[in-house]
Amino acid sequence: MSGRDLELTLDRVSSIEYPALVKEAFLNNWHASAHRSEVTSNCASLNDRYCWVLSRNQIFIWERAKSSHRAIIPTQLPLPTSGLPRSVKCVVVYDGVHRGANKTPCPGILVVSPEGVLRHWTSIESQTYIEEVLDINNEVALRVELTDEPIDGKSASFLLTTTSGTVYFLNGKGQDSAKTGALECNKVAGREAHGFRRRLSSIMFGGESKESTSLITNSFQHQSKDLLVVTVSPDVLTVYNMYTPCELWSLKTKEFFQPKIASFFEADLKRTPLKVRARLIDAAVFRDGLMILIGGTHEESQSVHMFMVWMSANWQTEQPTGVVWSARVPMNEHRALFSKIDDSIYSNLTLCIPKNTAESKKADRTDGIIIINPYFAVSLYLPFDLAKPKKPESLYRHVSIPPRDQLLGYAICSQYVYIMMLESGVSTIRLLPRGFADSSIYTHEQVVVPSLSVGTDDWPILSELLSEMVASGLPKTPLYQSLHRAFELFAEKHMAESEEELKAIIKMPDQEIARIVSQFLYAIIDYSDAANKTDTELHAKRVLTSRIMLFLKHMGVYERIISSPLGISRGGILSLRVGGTMLGEVSERVAASTAIWTWKTSNETNSAVFDAIIEKVLRIPEVQDLGLKDKDALFGRCGLVHHIPVVAAQQLEKNVIGKTKSHRFEVFHAVCELLSGIKETIISWRNCRTKVAIPKFPIWWTLETFASCYRDVAEKIIEELKNGSSTDSERARLLMYILSIYDFYLSESDSQPDNDKVLQEMIALGKPADAMELAEKHKDFGTLVKNYLTTDVGTRQKTFERYKKMFEKDDFEMYLCDYLKEHGRNDVLLQQGGSRVDAYLDNFKELRYSREIANKQFGKAALTLMSLADAETKSFSKFVEFLTRAYYCACSSIDGTDVSEVLDFYKRRYPEMKHRKRIPTEILKICFGNDLDAMMSVEDMLEWNMAVQPNDEASVEGFARAFHLLADLLAVHPDSDELKKKIDKTWKALVDYDEWNRVRSKEDVEKKTIFGKFCNYLINSYPADKGDSFPIWMPISRRLIFPTDIDTVLDECIANTTGNHLSWIKGHLKWIGEQLCKQALLPKSAFFRPDMKQVGSISQAALEAFGPILQRREQRFIDQLNRDSMMET
């Protein structure tokens, strides 16, 4: 049979069917998103034994072989949470070491989320897994592949590739990793990252930079002599050798492939094409070579053109030097998908070559090279030797995916390429004889399940059920019959007849209408018949209650009853409420009952806990009066559903839950899942766009019935977490339950929380962000203020200002003032602005200076602050604040107040403040321990600066700080004899610091003594503060520290100095004094030294260029001074 007689078909695999749970998951994904499916085109796959489907946060896996005597029950496994789209490329299903009931290996599953969270099941029968957070350097996981099967007690090993091109090796961790599934992650190879700074520098200064590479779109491993990993990105094709490990070779698209693509365009245009651009799409091994799919564009075409190139088997050992074979892939169908302006075509094409096809030297009995797109599939049939193409004509075939169907995923197996579709199931892509495939299977319609539908076709069934509800729960009076008929006519879209039927009721008072509607609705939600399925009955109640709300709204009844007084029974006690409370309660009771039923049927543990709960609920007097015996019959009584969460919370009491840890956590999880499910269902029902919006009244039914049990459960979870008996995974899970459960309690509560205890406990347990989110949502101002007081000033003040606007109606501003004053945070209180804060602060005398500043009475504020600074003897930070503010206020005073005393005080105390700040933290810790804010006197600062230091450099800097302090003080008090004595005492300490008996020469004095090094510091070292370009200590000030009588100082020294030592010291000081005199004559500009670290790259370059100029300028001044001194002599 010639190739022309072949056609590409989708051959249905009847032996593979989707289980009911998987179909339900598909339906849930559809209905959950308002007529938009959440099912992606990369969520399903299969292998020779199993199929699997990703659905939201779970994965379904089942055997391919269909059983004739029992239904297919898939295994459901939870997936790690992810904020990025999932892909089956990151799922590996393999044969594990465990044996099932039929003695066949149970599959193991490895799942990695895009963020790098790994879950590993060594056997799906155990339902236990290992979870690891892989260190993949904040990259996104792209693909995971199995490298080695589990053997000899070692776990299976895998290769993980990220979108950045990094390859990680996942291998077993521990001696028994085959059973535990523990894995460890090690980086094997990857592309070199090119930082932003290098590229920016290259742009600004013209340096050469490597061509940036784009994200990896696909990768795969190939086992030959070595284990190779091929990564494909639009710009680069890279091959890594895992055994080395290293990069084997890399080919850039622009340099290697683009010229070949340009030759095709040149042949078509008969001239050189312009703006040719090629992008790699995918690659696969074919006949030992490498087949590559490439997309190309040029200026004169608005479409993306497809090409295939093949490189010989040499690619496995060395970098290819050229393309062996290449061809254009015609894409004549679906041309709109290949528009040049839409780049999605590059990511939606996948190259699929089954193993047998890839290894076959001939194309006979193969299906060719398959290219898959969500809308079509293409086969390229190559019946010739690619290395020696005698007949280079290839066969191209195309098949479309059914228009009403959706691609779920694909699988490349040994023989075929499988595709999994939403409606049509599983098919293979086959090149079959023309007419062989029967396409009639694609024309069938989905069967509508009446119990689960909400359309017009289900109304006859719902109408029949409604009649049973009304007949069993209401008296046969004309009013109820009229309401029933009116609603029936409304549901059948006979609006005029419905309004006519309702006239008698419309004439009644609003309160009476509310009573009739209430009884009608309660007759619906409290109906129960053992002959009906519970889920079908609950769904019918939900549909009917929703439609009744629309009915009431459309007929003008809703507005009349929503505010009407209405008596509602609560445990046999009649409470006066309004019609709106009743309408919301009815709908939410049905939603809560549905949530409880879903929870009960989800797993066996929940069912067992439910039985224990129901046994206690049935003993409640209100329930006993109904004579219910069947446990499931309680679901038909939605009016009693509030007892279930209350009794469920009681199951967590210590005398009930039991002492076994495993059983205790099972009950904890079951109860928390129940409460979370009720909460989520009620909240989602309130937010449903299709229902009539009912305002929530202050006293809601949930608060009166069961909301308090949510707080009880949250407190029990916190108590359990404090015990410390839970594992990390259990702890994380319980914390997530608290967020959901306590959020519902706060939303239902009628009082505003303040510094809520549970929220504070959540912060202490490591969930500050979530706790703050709840506090902000529910207006717990105490928790908000307490938490943000621990943040930096900028963040704190911006947040407070935002809260003032957000909670303006709740008077957050005054709450903040009261809180700050009560907790002694006057510093933060003074940062607040506004007229209301000003009025508040006027009531407190201790904050007088702040008011004086606010009122621009700067002179008075300066005197107040000066007295505070003078009285401060404990806190240095407060002293600095008071002193600085006093000076600024004095400088800003324009009210005529005499502030000379303040300025003189600042002048006298400023040196103390300045030099106290320069003392290193290490010295302060030695002095005061952790109290780094302690005040220090001048004597203390001198003593600790001159203390023994760990090295000579630190000692010199310490003496420099001491002398600098004395110099600044002497500049303020030039006639102070006491300061001069302290200078002499400091010189004496400097000389006594060294062991002079080891000094043998004058050079030793300069190089080996602290005295000599300090003298050298005086003339050669001019450090500046960070960000300043001038020294902190100028030569003219350094001259002030010279002793008045050096002979007296040396005579009082206790150091073991000889006559030579004394002469060397005197000579050295004389020479230093001369040098400082010369330097003092230099202008200030001669000491200009810019801080290179505080300027940008361009400024730095400019300043570095001016550096030699400044140095020559300084040297010119020095030479001039030397010449002048020589002339004088």
UniProtKB/Swiss-Prot annotation:
One of its GO terms (cellular component) is nuclear pore outer ring. It is found in: Nucleus envelope; Nucleus, Nuclear pore complex. InterPro entries: Nucleoporin_Nup133/Nup155_N (IPR014908), Nup133-like (IPR037624), WD40/YVTN_repeat-like_dom_sf (IPR015943). The keyword Nucleotide-binding does not apply. Keywords: Developmental protein, mRNA transport, Nuclear pore complex, Nucleus, Protein transport, Translocation, Transport. Important for early nematode development. This is Nuclear pore complex protein 15.
